[in-house]
């Protein structure tokens, strides 16, 4: 078994992160903002961040909770304020910058007396991401037939120098069609070479070949092709023995040989005459070599070009004759002269092709062969020649044909044809991708392809360029990337030489120099020169103040782009941009999938420490802005500006999405809350606009993020939980442990190896439920493994790693579910979520069937008191434990007694050690809520039967035995806090007192002299908690009372009773009172009083209970125990569940659990069951349960426990009749939880109560004592039945007809008929709102004279009434208007 019992500390992530912040993160931020200037730069604030100190907290944790204060430390830094003009120090001293909330040992923060948790956030990691563009419209091909065929010429024709045809050849110039012009070429002396003829001839031959579409087309094409290549020589008869592959090989290398001969002139040496060699000295006049690149010399004159050109043309004529003689007589093997003078055959040619093409061939004896006429360099030279057009002699041109939309010819130069051809082959069918660069700070930068129909400054192979690469820093601002690089000072030559796919951006290889006269400066990019700052906003991307990749961003970019830059370079560099462009083009050609943004290698966790560090950065940035904008403020005022940092921190802890009120329902919920990972929050995802892909489970989540535990509803998949063994590394990536497997043996010595998601993809990893023998060798022949996010089977020798535990995959809450591999995932999700909602019971039990994690969850939950050091217990009481450590010091541990948790459950510690007991460090000293004897115990083991009972368990309802009520099986304690504010201002002055007029003695007997209820009092609804009175004003008194006071001169004014009473439906016992005093020297006055009331809640109809497998239900009836079905030994069943709740929900784990539970109950034994036990054999769970049931049956001599024909089913007897039920029934001990959805908190009734001020409709909700809304769908139901009068009542007197409802109340009290209803208030509000937008609506009353005549009378519905009291004047003429 590959199970590791020592799981890591469950809240280590939070604690380690906060400690890192205090030790290093805070220091980094203080160092970054060590010098701050005011607006005039005269005053400098200097923070000595390295010397900061933390002052001990004012309040302890317990006291901070009691007094609703913060548990925080003062951050003190030496501050120096210096006047730079006078060079004098105005202020120097220890300055308290902020009160920093301090983390408790249980990884929580106490803010305003409440425990809060900072949830870790999972966000996209800084780095570079490539994704495929969706819905990108592919450009339409230009459908001219000529153009289409011409573009394919390159694959068939030799793309060498175009043929120069001597005039005396037997075939005369070609004539194609009537409309096409024709040309004959005879002149060798013209500098402008006309290759029109070549184009036509090539096209004609190609068309002939392409028409052959029948069966042996390949052979025929090649045959025709070779025939044409022979020109007019005797037909080339190849032997039939050559197969197709040899022929195609021959054809492919034909082009290559041809180019080779002409371009590099590997011919016999004797054929070269001295006149055709150019001395190196002459070469130097044209070119100078710089950095291994040919570069034009500025002094090179145009006359030399003419001379060279004429030389060239003589040479071409000479070469043509040589080719005729040498090449066609010896086709297969052409003798080449190399330095070694060896014969080069076709195979070595294949290797030759892979070498880079060079534009100049330097040979020995200091002479250079003329090989650069068509190199890019000379082509550039020709551009600068004056255009001198001379018609060729003896050439006739009729109607020149435009093959392309632009007037360029199909083939201009040898390189053009070659590059265009390779460009199309390489890039024509490319896909479009976008690269997104996410820095640590700064906006995202996008690189992508964009259509641009303008001809660009730099030369492109296609004139109408549609695939320009642009850089974009926001939705509007964008620019072609090459423009940006040129603006930043790079030359074309540098850009080209740094790009792997330079041919995508540059048609020909650019020169280093831009012109013949002026020298181009080399790029010297200096960020601090003002010129570059003013170029454009894009220059900011190289500036660390605006764009900062950070440590993680640099690490990710280096990994993704295979760069070897130093990890401390936190800015974007040219190398990054070149690598991004290369990667974009490579992806476009290869059409591979883009990056998976949901992969955990591309997402990282920001924990408490990093969130606080970012918070300090934001605070200091606000401070810098504030000091920079303040003018002529006093020094003290400017120093007080530092409060803005404290305000930032308070704002984060108080109202951030990631700072949450801690879930303290039970120990499990509080532990899970601290291990939660949220995708929401600042910088995270937006819940409303998120896709399903982001919420989905990803293969890389394995062992890192739990696939089961996530909330139901809108946050599903966005909020997750760490798995049991996962941890977060220094860079924020989640790691999970594995054992190494070498040659089929699991190596378990030392610690397991932690792997991140990106490394894991390269190894074959086996799951934990693979059986091993005693020597740790894998025993199966075929083992299922994960490899590169796929699932394959391999032999044991190919396995690299194996998971350490079967529960490594799931979170802490899910790992508590036994047999969860038999449950459907949705039900397991509900099970793990509902365990977090279970209320700690007064008498809880450990589960009979557990999973073995209960002890560690109890230790790490923070709800118990753990020993800080080893020693011997000195004394134990209910309130404290004193431990004498071996070092001699005595430690006093104070226990919490009946404290209120955030969810109003009860936190109470009970000691479980005895005087004189030896204890170890970290051992649990007390039980806490939901913890019994060192183990988590959230519920009770109760006897359940799966059977229907009179319809009382229809649709998940639950029937329970009254034993659960009387024996306090599901009884819990809840503590509520009531805050009573004492108002003290100029108008109103409240006093608290016991002397309240007009009250009986029984009503005030439980108040003390201050008027506060005494401890231990049992209070019911309406009882006074705090007695308060307020003096009446004169205006409030009746006239006769004023008269009497004036006559008899009464000294005391009347007082009004404003005492705080228990709300309706609430009861309990007063367990604590806390008073808060005003900070006044004059008198001892209370400001606020808190009263804590504990109530014992037994289980009742309407409460929600659930199992651990997502089987939840509401209690529908509590049956007397004598009516419950009972077992043959007389034990009545505690709970009856509906058997139909199992098959459709597919949570069969509950049956396994309850059957093993009854076996354990009878055997007096508890079981720890790990999931995924199929490694020991098929159906092991079922076999184990049958064995244990049989064993229990034998040991207890109770044969009815195990029936081999229907194992797990027992005979039940009906408690009402005493007869057996017809069929055996599944009975067992299930572990059931009482959930916090209690009926006491939800039950609510209202007769009359408060109304909304404007619409005058009743308020909603229990807290406002509101009514029950009769909503839209309920109205449809009444409309469907035509219940008109019921509807009318609901719309008027039961809702917002103010006058009508008062009159109705009077009528009901007096027993009179209910009067007609009036106009609803909301209708009047609608009228007023329509008037506010300029629509004047009037209401009219229709009066009938007789059947045919009537007249209309306008009625003003908006009566004048006292707006404060909203009461009508007594005279109203609306009696007869009805709605």
From Swiss-Prot:
Molecular function per GO: DNA binding; DNA-directed RNA polymerase activity; ribonucleoside binding
Subcellular compartments: Plastid, Chloroplast
Enzyme class (EC, first level): transferase
Top-level lineage group: Eukaryota
Gene Ontology CC annotations of this record: chloroplast; DNA-directed RNA polymerase complex; mitochondrion
Major place of residence: plastid
Presence of keyword Nucleotidyltransferase: yes
Catalysed reactions, semicolon-separated: RNA(n) + a ribonucleoside 5'-triphosphate = RNA(n+1) + diphosphate
SUPFAM superfamilies, per database record: beta and beta-prime subunits of DNA dependent RNA-polymerase
InterPro entries, per database record: DNA-dir_RNA_pol_bsu_ext_1_sf, DNA-dir_RNA_pol_bsu_external_1, DNA-dir_RNA_pol_su2, DNA-dir_RNAP_su2_dom, DNA-dir_RNAP_su2_hyb_sf, RNA_pol_bsu_bac, RNA_pol_bsu_CS, RNA_pol_bsu_protrusion
Example GO BP: DNA-templated transcription
Key words, A-Z: Chloroplast, DNA-directed RNA polymerase, Nucleotidyltransferase, Plastid, Transcription, Transferase
CDD domains: RNA_pol_B_RPB2 (cd00653)
Quaternary structure note: In plastids the minimal PEP RNA polymerase catalytic core is composed of four subunits: alpha, beta, beta', and beta''. When a (nuclear-encoded) sigma factor is associated with the core the holoenzyme is formed, which can initiate transcription.
Annotated family: Belongs to the RNA polymerase beta chain family.
Summary of the function given for this chain in its UniProt record: DNA-dependent RNA polymerase catalyzes the transcription of DNA into RNA using the four ribonucleoside triphosphates as substrates.
Name the record gives this protein: DNA-directed RNA polymerase subunit beta
Species this chain originates from: Trieres chinensis (Marine centric diatom)
Gene that produces this protein: rpoB
């Amino acid at each position: 078994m590959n199970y590791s019992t020592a799981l890591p500390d469950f809240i280590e992530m939070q604690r380690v992160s906060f400690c890192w912040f205090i030790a290093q993160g805070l220091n980094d931020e203080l160092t970054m903002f060590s010098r701050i200037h005011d607006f005039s730069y005269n005053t400098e604030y200097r923070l000595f961040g390295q010397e900061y100190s933390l002052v001990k907290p004012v309040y302890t944790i317990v006291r901070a909770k009691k007094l609703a204060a913060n548990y925080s430390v003062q951050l003190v830094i030496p501050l120096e304020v210096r006047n730079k003009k006078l060079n004098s120090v105005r202020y120097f001293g220890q300055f308290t910058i902020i009160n920093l909330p301090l983390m408790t040992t249980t990884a929580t923060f106490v803010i305003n007396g409440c425990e809060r948790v900072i949830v870790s956030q999972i966000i996209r990691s800084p780095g570079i991401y490539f994704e495929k563009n969706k819905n990108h419209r592919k450009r339409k091909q230009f459908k001219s037939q000529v153009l289409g065929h011409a573009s394919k010429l390159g694959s068939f024709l030799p793309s060498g120098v175009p043929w120069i045809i001597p005039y005396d050849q037997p075939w005369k110039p070609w004539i194609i069609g009537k409309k096409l012009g024709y040309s004959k070429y005879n002149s060798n002396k013209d500098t402008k070479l006309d290759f029109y003829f070549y184009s036509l001839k090539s096209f004609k031959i190609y068309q002939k070949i392409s028409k052959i579409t029948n069966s042996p087309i390949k052979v025929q094409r090649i045959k025709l092709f070779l025939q044409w290549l022979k020109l007019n020589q005797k037909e080339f008869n190849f032997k039939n023995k050559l197969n197709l592959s040899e022929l195609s090989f021959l054809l492919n290398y034909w082009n290559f040989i041809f180019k080779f001969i002409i371009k590099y002139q590997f011919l016999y040496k004797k054929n070269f005459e001295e006149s055709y060699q150019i001395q190196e000295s002459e070469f130097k006049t044209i070119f100078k070599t710089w950095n291994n690149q040919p570069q034009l010399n500025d002094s090179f004159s145009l006359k030399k070009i003419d001379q060279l050109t004429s030389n060239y043309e003589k040479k071409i004529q000479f070469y043509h004759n040589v080719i005729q003689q040498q090449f066609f007589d010896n086709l297969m093997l052409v003798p080449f002269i190399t330095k070694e003078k060896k014969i080069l055959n076709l195979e070595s040619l294949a290797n030759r092709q892979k070498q880079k093409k060079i534009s100049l061939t330097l040979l020995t004896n200091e002479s250079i062969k003329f090989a650069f006429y068509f190199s890019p360099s000379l082509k550039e030279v020709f551009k600068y020649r004056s255009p001198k057009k001379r018609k060729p002699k003896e050439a006739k041109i009729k109607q020149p044909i435009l093959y392309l939309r632009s007037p360029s010819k199909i083939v201009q130069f040898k390189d053009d044809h070659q590059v265009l051809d390779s460009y199309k082959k390489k890039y024509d069918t490319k896909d479009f991708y976008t690269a997104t660069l996410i820095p640590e700070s700064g906006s995202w930068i996008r690189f992508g392809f964009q259509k641009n129909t303008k001809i660009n400054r730099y030369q492109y192979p296609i004139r109408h360029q549609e695939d320009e690469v642009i850089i974009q820093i926001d939705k509007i601002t964008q620019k072609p990337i090459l423009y940006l690089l040129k603006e930043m000072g790079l030359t074309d030559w540098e850009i080209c030489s740094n790009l792997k796919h330079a041919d995508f951006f540059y048609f020909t290889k650019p020169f280093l120099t831009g012109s013949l006269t002026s020298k181009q400066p080399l790029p010297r990019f200096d960020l601090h020169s003002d010129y570059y700052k003013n170029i454009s906003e894009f220059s900011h991307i190289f500036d660390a103040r605006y764009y900062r990749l950070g440590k993680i961003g640099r690490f990710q970019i280096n990994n993704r782009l295979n760069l070897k830059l130093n990890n401390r370079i936190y800015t974007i560099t040219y190398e990054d941009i070149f690598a991004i462009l290369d990667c974009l083009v490579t992806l476009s050609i290869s059409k591979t999938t883009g990056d998976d943004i949901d992969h955990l290698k591309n997402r990282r966790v920001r924990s408490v420490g990093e969130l606080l560090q970012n918070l300090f950065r934001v605070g200091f940035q606000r401070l810098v802005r504030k000091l920079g904008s303040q003018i002529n403020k006093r020094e003290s005022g400017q120093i007080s500006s530092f409060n803005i940092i404290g305000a930032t921190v308070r704002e984060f802890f108080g109202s951030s999405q990631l700072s949450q009120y801690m879930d303290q329902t039970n120990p499990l919920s509080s532990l899970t809350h601290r291990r939660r990972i949220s995708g929401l929050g600042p910088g995270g995802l937006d819940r409303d606009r998120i896709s399903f892909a982001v919420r989905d489970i990803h293969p890389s989540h394995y062992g890192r993020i739990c696939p089961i535990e996530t909330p139901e509803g809108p946050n599903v998949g966005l909020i997750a939980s760490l798995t049991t063994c996962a941890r977060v590394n220094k860079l924020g990536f989640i790691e999970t442990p594995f054992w190494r497997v070498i040659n089929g043996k699991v190596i378990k010595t030392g610690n397991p190896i932690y792997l991140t998601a990106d490394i894991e993809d390269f190894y074959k990893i086996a799951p934990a439920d693979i059986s091993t023998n005693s020597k740790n060798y894998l025993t199966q022949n075929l083992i299922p493994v994960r490899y590169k996010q796929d699932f394959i089977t391999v032999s044991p020798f190919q396995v690299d790693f194996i998971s350490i535990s079967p529960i490594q995959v799931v979170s802490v809450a899910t790992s508590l579910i036994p047999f969860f591999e038999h449950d459907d995932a949705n039900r397991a999700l509900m099970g793990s979520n509902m365990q977090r909602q279970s209320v700690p019971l007064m008498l809880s039990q450990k589960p009979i069937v557990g999973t073995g994690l209960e002890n560690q969850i109890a230790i790490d939950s923070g709800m118990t008191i753990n020993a800080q050091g080893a020693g011997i217990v000195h004394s134990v009481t209910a309130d404290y434990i004193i431990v004498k450590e071996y070092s001699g010091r005595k430690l006093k541990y104070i226990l919490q007694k009946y404290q209120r948790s955030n969810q109003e459950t009860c936190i109470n510690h009970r000691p479980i050690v005895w005087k004189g007991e030896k204890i170890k460090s970290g051992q649990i000293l007390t039980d806490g809520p939901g913890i019994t004897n060192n183990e988590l115990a959230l519920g009770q083991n109760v006897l359940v039967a799966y059977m229907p009972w009179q319809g009382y368990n229809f649709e998940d309802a639950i029937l329970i035995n009254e034993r659960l009520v009387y024996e306090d099986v599901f009884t819990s304690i809840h503590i509520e806090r009531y805050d009573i504010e004492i108002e003290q201002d100029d108008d109103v002055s409240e006093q608290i007192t016991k002397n309240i007029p007009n009250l009986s003695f029984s009503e005030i007997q439980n108040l003390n002299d201050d008027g506060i209820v005494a401890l231990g009092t049992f209070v019911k609804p309406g009882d006074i908690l705090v007695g308060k009175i307020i003096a009446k004003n004169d205006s409030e008194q009746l006239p006769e009372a004023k008269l009497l006071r004036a006559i008899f001169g009464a000294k005391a004014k009347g007082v009004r009773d404003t005492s705080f009473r228990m709300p309706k439906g609430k009861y309990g016992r007063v367990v604590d009172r806390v008073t808060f005093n005003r900070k006044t020297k004059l008198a001892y006055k209370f400001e606020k009083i808190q009263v804590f009331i504990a109530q014992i809640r037994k289980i009742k109809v309407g409460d929600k209970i659930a199992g651990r497998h997502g089987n939840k239900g509401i209690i529908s009836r509590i049956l007397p125990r004598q009516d419950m079905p009972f077992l043959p030994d007389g034990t009545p069943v505690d709970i009856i569940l509906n058997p139909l709740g199992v098959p459709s929900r597919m949570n069969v784990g509950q049956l396994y659990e309850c059957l093993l539970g009854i076996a354990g109950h009878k055997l007096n034994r508890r079981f720890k069951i790990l999931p995924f036990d199929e490694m020991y054999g098929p159906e092991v769970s079922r076999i184990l349960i049958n064995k244990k049931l049989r064993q229990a049956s034998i040991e207890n001599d109770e044969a009815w426990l195990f029936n081999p024909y229907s194992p797990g089913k027992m005979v039940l007897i009906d408690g009402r009749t005493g007869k057996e039920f017809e069929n055996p029934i599944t009975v067992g001990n299930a572990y059931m939880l009482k959930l916090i959805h209690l009926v006491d908190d939800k039950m609510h009734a209202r007769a009359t109560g408060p109304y909304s001020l404007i619409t005058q409709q009743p308020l909603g909700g229990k807290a406002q004592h509101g009514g029950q809304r009769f909503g839209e769908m309920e109205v449809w139901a009444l409309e469907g039945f035509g219940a008109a009068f019921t509807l009318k009542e609901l719309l008027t007197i039961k809702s917002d007809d103010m006058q009508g409802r008062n009159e109705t109340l009077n009528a009901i009290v007096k027993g009179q008929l209910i009067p007609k209803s009036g106009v609803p208030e909301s209708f009047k509000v609608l009228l007023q709102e329509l008037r506010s937008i300029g629509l004047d609506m009037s209401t009219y009353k229709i009066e009938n004279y007789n059947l045919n005549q009537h007249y209309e009378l306008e009625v003003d519905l908006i009566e004048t009434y006292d707006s404060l009291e909203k009461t009508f004047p007594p005279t109203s003429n609306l009696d007869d208007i009805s709605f």
